[in-house]
């Protein structure tokens, strides 16, 4: 039994290193060199094919604009202040109850101050009335960064914070700021005049994407009271000269046009559901995404 064990150990040692044939693990030095050379060339070719494929793919991709945008959803509509559960509840005589809402609006509007838009190399005046979309060339680096339209806070009227630092909350007349989320290259298409006949409050303007805020439910419609809109040219919507958006690389300081909405006589001590909706030929709505083209917010002014 001891001999068998010794013989077995000897065969293993001989397999690892055979001094007679000069073999290591059953192969000579030349054989090991050839097989290693084969695998180096084989995996080198695989790596080359992979890198080449990636390079070819990168040549078809622009860093400024996606090649395919056919599945990009229409832009969402959001409001400031941005709050959890989209509920605004406060007492006009209690500053602490609306302090968070006011601070949220103040912080958002910081970049819209005149002092932040003075650089003429970045910003330009695009008029005080709505006009057509402002094309700024192809989506590439040939012309460098593109200029951005200025947006004046004074256009937001009572909701600008210039005359009322509480944005109406102190008087029980809350303001919300509405913006259309950025989508690269998106150009809004306002609805046709005849499609607005069922919305008498909305006036047709071919250069404005209109927005309307109404009561969400039938019982809310009589409680929402008067609604005032403040925007560029006193238009209740988004002017088209701020579109299309060219992205962070070409327009790092881009300012979205804003629309301010003030509710001046909401029914007190009542939770009112309000829906704000943008109207356009290329604005869509989805039951799965309640912010796509619209949003709803609950507002309660307590006595």
From Swiss-Prot:
Topology of this chain in the membrane: Single-pass type II membrane protein
S-S pairs: 126-149, 159-175, 213-276
Post-translational modification: Glutathionylated. N-glycosylated.
Residue positions the entry lists as glycosylated: 158, 193, 265
One cellular component (GO) term of this entry: lateral plasma membrane
Keywords linked to the UniProt accession: Cell adhesion, Cell membrane, Disulfide bond, Glutathionylation, Glycoprotein, Immunity, Innate immunity, Ion transport, Membrane, Phosphoprotein, Potassium, Potassium transport, Signal-anchor, Sodium, Sodium transport, Sodium/potassium transport, Transmembrane, Transmembrane helix, Transport
Phosphoserine modified-residue sites: 11
Region ranges (immunoglobulin-like): 191-303
UniProt topological domain (Cytoplasmic) ranges: 1-34
One function term, GO molecular function aspect: ATPase activator activity
Record comment regarding domains: The C-terminal lobe folds into an immunoglobulin-like domain and mediates cell adhesion properties.
Quaternary structure (record): The sodium/potassium-transporting ATPase is composed of a catalytic alpha subunit, an auxiliary non-catalytic beta subunit and an additional regulatory subunit. Interacts with catalytic subunit ATP12A. Interacts with regulatory subunit FXYD1. Interacts with regulatory subunit FXYD3. Interacts with NKAIN1, NKAIN2 and NKAIN4. Interacts with MLC1. Part of a complex containing MLC1, TRPV4, AQP4 and HEPACAM. Interacts with KIRREL3. Interacts with OBSCN (via protein kinase domain 1). Interacts with TRAF3 and TRAF6.
Physiological role: This is the non-catalytic component of the active enzyme, which catalyzes the hydrolysis of ATP coupled with the exchange of Na(+) and K(+) ions across the plasma membrane. The beta subunit regulates, through assembly of alpha/beta heterodimers, the number of sodium pumps transported to the plasma membrane. Plays a role in innate immunity by enhancing virus-triggered induction of interferons (IFNs) and interferon stimulated genes (ISGs). Mechanistically, enhances the ubiquitination of TRAF3 and TRAF6 as well as the phosphorylation of TAK1 and TBK1. Involved in cell adhesion and establishing epithelial cell polarity.
Protein's name in the database: Sodium/potassium-transporting ATPase subunit beta-1
Organism: Pan troglodytes
Gene: ATP1B1
């Amino acid at each position: 039994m001891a001999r068998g064990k010794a013989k077995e150990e000897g065969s293993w040692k001989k397999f690892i290193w055979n001094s007679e044939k000069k073999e290591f693990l059953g192969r000579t030095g030349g054989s090991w060199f050839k097989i290693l050379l084969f695998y180096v060339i084989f995996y080198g070719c695989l790596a080359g094919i992979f890198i080449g494929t990636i390079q070819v793919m990168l040549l078809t991709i622009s860093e400024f604009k996606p090649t395919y945008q056919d599945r990009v959803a229409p832009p969402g509509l959001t409001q400031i202040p941005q709050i959890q559960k989209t509920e605004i509840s406060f007492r006009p005589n209690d500053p602490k109850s609306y302090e968070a809402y006011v601070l949220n609006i103040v912080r958002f509007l910081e970049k819209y101050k005149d002092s932040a838009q003075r650089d003429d190399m970045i910003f330009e005046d695009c008029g005080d009335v709505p006009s057509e979309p402002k094309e700024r060339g192809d989506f590439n680096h040939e012309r460098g960064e593109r200029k951005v339209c200025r947006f004046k806070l004074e256009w937001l009227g009572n909701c600008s914070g210039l005359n009322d630092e509480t944005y109406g909350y102190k008087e029980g007349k809350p303001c919300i700021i509405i913006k259309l989320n950025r989508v690269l290259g998106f150009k809004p298409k306002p609805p046709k005049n005849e499609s607005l006949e069922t919305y008498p409050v909305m006036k047709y303007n071919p250069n404005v994407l209109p927005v309307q805020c109404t009561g969400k439910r039938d019982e809310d419609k009589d409680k929402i009271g008067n609604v005032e809109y403040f925007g560029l040219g006193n238009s209740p919507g988004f002017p088209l000269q701020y579109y299309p958006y060219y992205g962070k690389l070409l327009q790092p300081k881009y300012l979205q046009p804003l629309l301010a909405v003030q509710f001046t006589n909401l029914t007190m001590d009542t939770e009112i559901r309000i829906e704000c909706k943008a109207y356009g030929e290329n604005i869509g709505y989805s039951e799965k995404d309640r912010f796509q083209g619209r949003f709803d917010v609950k507002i309660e002014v307590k006595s």
